[in-house]
Amino acid sequence: MSHNHDHNHDHEVITLVDEQGNETLFEILLTIDGREEFGKNYVLLVPAGAEEDADGEIEIQAYSFTENEDGTEGDLQPIPEDSDAEWDMIEEVFNSFIDEN
């Protein structure tokens, strides 16, 4: 999934830690409420400070998440590649987001 729009606005940031303990800072591009259809929410992330490639695009990562009861943190999970219904919904919402921005 790629993303191409004006970055002259602030994004919330999140730090992801990989299996080796390396921390990477990401900007939260978009959150999606998918609880009604899939029982979870989704977040689209871009690496903090990422520059557009030659085609004017930036790589986007998508995760599902469940917030803790206090709404402050939660667990991010990769979205299964074979979950076509989830990916279709994410793509539809993302495309609407891009069209509006």
From Swiss-Prot:
For this chain, the family text in UniProt reads:
Belongs to the UPF0473 family.
Instruction: Write down the InterPro entries for this protein, in alphabetical order.
Output: UPF0473
- Which NCBIfam families has this protein been placed in? PRK13678.1-2 (NF010215), PRK13678.1-4 (NF010217)
Q: Which organism is it from?
A: Streptococcus thermophilus (strain ATCC BAA-250 / LMG 18311)
Name of this protein:
UPF0473 protein stu1961
